[in-house]
């Protein structure tokens, strides 16, 4: 009997990585894993290291839209392998996703008046082997007081239940391992949230909403424009045995559906979306706004937009990712 297969794709995006990642999320609704050779070495994954180092990477470029074998080129430019994105699917997406990604690349060239390219590899493996490898790779992480772990890892006896967040990172949503999520949790942990009302924009897995509830917010609203994210948030609320009170809401849709003002707003998104939401955050924020998911290269453009309405209280950076804690400027009478 043949084993069921799954497919693994590796992508390198030299420019505007977050735009390409957003496209992959929208196109597939599958998990994306940001990784590097250093991460693979840490997990002693010699098989994958050998595969990505020795395989012939496919290449697409808007200035020369013919795929090329760039094995030798990559050997001459090892920085390409420092950061890459992994996508796993039960279906072979070579004949659908890759052409769509090429078309997206050409659209970017037309819209942004710049050249773009990407590299990719794919392989297929036995599903059972992948599932076990996946579980071994998703380890618990300690982020401030929170111990974040998947359901197949038990919490240590010395960690109290209220400091645990159980997340099974099966979809493309926050699990606490990504720098932008961990910095959000750190910034939230520094705030007294008891009896505050809070808004989580782009709730994803619900990890930040769960942290807000565990820190004592009296009313919570979470929203996401992805229906799968709303389902995942509700599932993880149940998994963590956190009841949704009458004043709590999980909304499918954007901030336009939300009324009132909030003491604390957290938004772990991407820079372009954060910039587009400025006027909404001015309308909804009463005091503190936490923004994350900003690549360092986009930080100045975000700050230029938010300068008039908010004061920067704190800025954190981990690798290329930046998070901001902002204070709403009050109008002068």
From Swiss-Prot:
Listed Pfam families: PrmA (PF06325)
One Gene Ontology cellular component annotation held by this UniProt entry: cytoplasm
Impact reported for residue 144 to A: In strain: NCTC 11638
Keywords: Cytoplasm, Methyltransferase, S-adenosyl-L-methionine, Transferase
Compartment annotation: Cytoplasm
Catalyzed reaction equations: L-lysyl-[protein] + 3 S-adenosyl-L-methionine = N(6),N(6),N(6)-trimethyl-L-lysyl-[protein] + 3 S-adenosyl-L-homocysteine + 3 H(+)
Effect on the protein upon substituting residue 78 to S: In strain: NCTC 11638
Any Gene Ontology biological process: methylation
Binding site for S-adenosyl-L-methionine: 181, 202, 224, 268
InterPro entries: Ribosomal_L11_MeTrfase_PrmA (IPR050078), Ribosomal_PrmA_MeTrfase (IPR004498), SAM-dependent_MTases_sf (IPR029063)
EC number(s) recorded for this UniProt protein: 2.1.1.-
One GO molecular-function entry: protein methyltransferase activity
Top EC category: transferase
Disulfide bonds: none
Homology family: Belongs to the methyltransferase superfamily. PrmA family.
Functional note: Methylates ribosomal protein L11.
Protein name (Swiss-Prot/TrEMBL): Ribosomal protein L11 methyltransferase
Organism of provenance: Helicobacter pylori (strain ATCC 700392 / 26695)
Name of the gene: prmA
